[in-house]
Amino acid sequence: MDYNFNLEHPFFFTNNDYSTDTSIKYQVSLPFNWHEVMNNDEWVYQYPIGKFVERQGWKIHISSEYNSSHELLQDVAKICHEMRIPFKHLSTEDKFIMRNGKLVSRGFSGKFITCYPNQNELESVLQRLESALKQYNGPYILSDKRWDEAPIYLRYGVFRPSRDDEKKVAIDELIVGDEVVKDERLPVFKIPKGIVPPDFLNKWLDKKDKKQGDFPFIIDNAIRFSNSGGIYNARLKEDGKKIILKEARPYTGLGFDGTYSSEKLASECKALKILNEWSETPKIYWHGKIWEHTFLGIEHMKGVPLNRWVTNNFPLYEVVDKTKDYLLRVSKIVEKLIDLTNKFHSENVYHQDLHLGNILVKDEDEISIIDWEQAVFSNDEKVVHKVAAPGFRAWRETLPSEIDWYGIRQIAHYLYMPLVTTSDLTYNYVSQTRIEGKKLFESLGYTREHIDYVESLLSYLDSKCPQIENISRKKVLKSMHEIRTIESEQDIQDFIIKLLRGFTLTYGQWRKEFQSRFFPVHYYGLNFNQGIAFSDLAILWSYQQLAKKVKNFKFDDYYEIRTQVINEAVNNFKKSSLSGLFDGKIGTIWLIYEFGEIDRAVELFTTHFIEIFENSQNKNLYSGQAGILLVGLYFLSKGEIDNKLGEEILIRLREYTLNYIENPETFCKVGASDVQSNDPYENFGGLLYGHAGVAWLFGEAYKLTGESIYKNGLELAVDKELVAYKVDSN
């Protein structure tokens, strides 16, 4: 899922509308009898007053490189004005950069201007645009096919919403004959089934894009894709040598510093050439251009990412830490990282993106450093650390060398106690994790000598990073240095009270600045406010559960806030398009019931259950039918619904179970997930997203009904879940 979020606030995730876009605007003159409108902050529309525009047709998309974008817009606008062709363009340079960034959806990227000609105008406007724009460059728009030499692209799609006298369909649906077809925006050119192109387009459709040269490598599989291109496992044709192949599409991956992915790939190539004699950095086996894309083929370095090495080796428990060698191994790795950093700095190479994923560990704890695309080659001026993994972003403007040392410092602290992500919010947070790390290793029986040596390495790396006093309009948040040991019930009470006070302080700070919702939330939840994962209702319920653990804790205005939050959830109930337990309507109903608003919850459930279930597209616990049915069973067990609705729930439950038993693979992925992500819409395994959640549903169904079909479903779901698991050798 694409998330609209902003990182400029010092404490909270916010929507993109939090900050004012002060970048340069794209503007064109408005002729007489034309109208201009800005329906959102991304696009500016211009159209001739009184002209009929077809509902759908061949869209003309135009891309541009950043430096010539204003001039290109003027040339396109002149033609559209003269030919009375409606068009839209991006509103500001910041929007342009985001549309061409590395992480933007490949189905949307690159589109700077869209023209909406009626079909009888299409050929002539294409000819004029091609003649006027030949001298310009721009990224290839993956959802379209290029018209000729200029950065002009076409795809068939929706132009505008349906009018009152037309067939009513959604804005993302096409009318093809008597059928309604989805207007898919995919990163591949595709003509919707049933669309007959005009004659002059058929020759164009048969024409292949010009490609030059033969691939000197064989691609085995893709590691990942981005708007900038792919990263692949590949082999050289010449000798079969395994390589990592990196691809850069031209004029993509644009950053706010004005550099493209091809320039970043060139930086990586330059860095690796300078460091070519090292065994700890990849060798270059092939570099060049094929068609319009740049490729870099580098050595396939052995080893596992350092974060995975920590997962496999960190000694949380005495029973799995018999050798007591973890700190010795950490010392060895950190010493090597310090030595390597000094060596590449002596060559005037500065990595700028050092984090756990870019350090590989192989046998005998030998290490290598990969992903040099952010590398710079001067240490003369202070810069802002723009690209960084969570917990590894250096604070304030600083020298490139100090950015690298900050990364090494954070890595070392992570090896000692793997909790550094909060460093982006709390300055010097690792001073706190260091205390806890020392306590842990003392409790596990590590020697004073080993602990002190690692501590000395941490102190050395701390000294390599500049100290700061202030970071924003707020004083720097300090880390907590007090050592806390939970030894009694009163200690637990005191700790909970501190958490609750922190909650109330955070709530107060948030409400001073924002009215869009009651509580701050992770950016995964910014765009919806229903369900038990990220809604205001869920956050307040969690607070309430915590407050029940202590005596006489008072939150001013709690009952007033509770009433407002519940009313807000009910008032916005129908606006939500999501149905699930964690992200949608059924979760909201359950929360309202748990708050004691039983009549309101039962009314919502009785009125909307069938609709919620039928509209759900997923099968899992988090956002799909398993979670919806689980809440249905909950209400059945409470005796809160009539027999007719109860029968409807059980009918759907039985049908769901039979379908699962027949073909569980269509419900959830069987085996390990292809993607490792915290994003709830990219995850396909475990309790919330996989067969374990389905098993929970069947277990509750068996407890309630005693019917063997649910026991059979439970056993099958557990078996399917366990396919993805491995036995821990420890």
Which residues make up each language-model segment?
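Catalytic-loop of the protein kinase fold
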Residues: T341-V361
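C-lobe/activation-segment region of protein kinase-like
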Residues: E373-L440
